[in-house]
Amino acid sequence: MNEMIRFPLQLTDSAINRIKTLIAEEANPHLKFRVYITGGGCSGLQYGFTFDDKVNEEDIAIEKQGVVLIVDPISLQYLLGGLVDYSEGLKGSRFFIINPNVQTTCSCGSSFSMT
C-alpha cells in the first residue's frame, strides 16, 4: 500500500516531540517511527518500536505533525484505535501504547493478550 492515510492509530504530542528529538539526534530526516507487534512477553504479545528509513510496499504510513508512523498490516489489526504515547519518570522513559483492544496486560505493561 505504502501511501499516507488517516488512520485510527494516534500519536500524543509527547510521543511526537520525543520522536522528533530522536530523529534530529540521528541526523537522518528520512527516518520513520515503526510500531509493530511480536510474539513474546508474559502475556503472549508485545509492542515494539524502532526507527526505519524504508517503508515496505504493504506498510501503512500515518503522518502527524511531521512525524511518519509506519505499521505493517499484521500488527495493524492489533493496534486499531490505539494511542502511541511517551512518558518520562522515576522508572525511566518509554514509548507505550494505550490499546482499547487488549484483554489483559502483564504487570510491567509491555506485553498483552487479546481474545
From Swiss-Prot:
Alphabetical list of Pfam families matching this protein: Fe-S_biosyn (PF01521)
Function, as annotated: Required for insertion of 4Fe-4S clusters for at least IspG.
Cofactors: iron-sulfur cluster
Name of the featured protein: Iron-sulfur cluster insertion protein ErpA
PROSITE patterns: HESB
Keywords attached to this entry: Iron, Iron-sulfur, Metal-binding
Note on how the cofactor is bound: Binds 1 iron-sulfur cluster per subunit.
GO cellular component: cytosol
Assembly: Homodimer.
Positions contributing to iron-sulfur cluster binding: C42, C106, C108
InterPro entries with a match to the protein in the record: FeS_biogenesis, FeS_cluster_insertion, FeS_cluster_insertion_CS, FeS_cluster_insertion_RrpA, HesB-like_dom_sf
Source organism of the structure: Baumannia cicadellinicola subsp. Homalodisca coagulata
One GO process term, biological-process aspect: iron-sulfur cluster assembly
GO MF annotations in UniProt: 2 iron, 2 sulfur cluster binding; 4 iron, 4 sulfur cluster binding; iron ion binding
Family in the record: Belongs to the HesB/IscA family.
Phylogenetic placement of the source organism: Bacteria, Pseudomonadati, Pseudomonadota, Gammaproteobacteria, Candidatus Palibaumannia
